[in-house]
Amino acid sequence: MHGVTITELIEKMHLRNSTPQIDTDKIVLTHPDVNRPALQLTGFFDHFDRERVQIIGYVEQAYIKTMERDVKRQMFDKLTSSQIPCLVFSRGQEPDDDLLEYCNYYGVPCLVSDK
């Protein structure tokens, strides 16, 4: 299987790893596209391409901040349990502690870009 490991992505894109306990050498990206999971944050997972890197941008983060904690935790559980390769937060935004809990549980690297 050809692809790029999450470790290579971290190094080439100068990302910070918020989940360093996850072995990113074992996760290989095989899909060149990315996804911004706006609809998935609302609970809609039909036609969700879980092979793509998931990007949490400013709009997605703003929406997450409006959610009640129990709803947010349910959404984080569903998103991270769907076997996505990783999550990337853009513009230096920090992931929620509850999200990091689920990322660690399901082995999903959570990365942060300063750009």
Residue positions per predicted region:
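Gly/Thr-rich phosphate-binding loop signature of adenosyl cofactor/nucleotide-binding cores
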Residues: 1-80
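Short acidic/polar active-site loop segments enriched in Thr and Asp
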Residues: 85
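Acidic-aromatic/histidine active-site loop/patch
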Residues: 92
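Short, well-ordered alpha-helical microsegments
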Residues: 95-99
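Long, charge-dense
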Residues: 106-115
